[in-house]
Amino acid sequence: PICGSAIEREEGEVAARCTGGLVCAAQRREAIRHFASRRAMDIDGLGERYIEDLIAFDYVHSIADLYKLALDDFLAMKRRAEERDGSIPEAVKAGKIATRWADNLVAAIEASKDTSLERFLFALGIPDVGEATAKTLARHFGSLDVLMHASETELTEVNDVGPIMAAHIAAFFAEPRNREAITALRKAGVHWQESAPQRKAQGPLAGQTVVLTGSLSSLTRDEAKDRLEALGAKVA
């Protein structure tokens, strides 16, 4: 890979996979888009156009760089993009610069530092780890450090984590550049409350699978899902 990270190839498969998801230039845009998405770190307002321009003008090289951005960086990025596209607004030509959008982005990035372990795990974009698996991993291990040092055998003890997924998770955390990116994120202030490991689902619906269909009158689908999972159910 162009990032220099290790590659992995499943037995019997032709395609190889780069393990440098957090730092690989070829995957950078998608990694940042996923990291900032609503169900991940929820950085409101950081859309694809801004992400493309931040990358094009070398403001970000990895997801950790998002937390180094200041108001002036966003304003300079916007000005350079307008000059590139030949679309400088008349108000800007007259010396009037709108800054509220940039203020809101800086505030959204700052607010995203206070998150949960399950959201953070999902935001990392680990291969095959969706929201449900991220939540299961967070509850099973309780701590990111414990999870990062878990063996493939220990990972397969987690509900719904098979050998292939365990190998992907282990390879992701074994890649030094991914670990460096995670360390940089934590140093930037990204944090969450860790908890005691919960090896088995608890609650009156533990061990049951619930399928949500149709429309709900008083809850959003996400709210209903969160409540059911809090009662121990697995929501399909």
What are these regions (language model features)?
Residues 35, 77-236:
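DNA strand-break repair and replication-stress modules
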Residues 25-27, 62, 218-219:
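Flexible loop/turn segments at secondary-structure boundaries
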Residues 44, 48-85, 92-93, 153-157:
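Compact, charge-rich alpha-helical regulatory domains located at protein termini
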Residues 1-44:
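Cys/His-rich short segments
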Residues 11, 65-66, 132, 196:
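Short loop/turn and capping residues at structural boundaries
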Residues 11-15, 29-33, 48-49, 148-149, ...:
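Short acidic (Asp/Glu) and glycine-rich catalytic loops that position anionic groups and cofactors
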Residues 26, 44-48, 57-60, 68, ...:
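Conserved structured core elements
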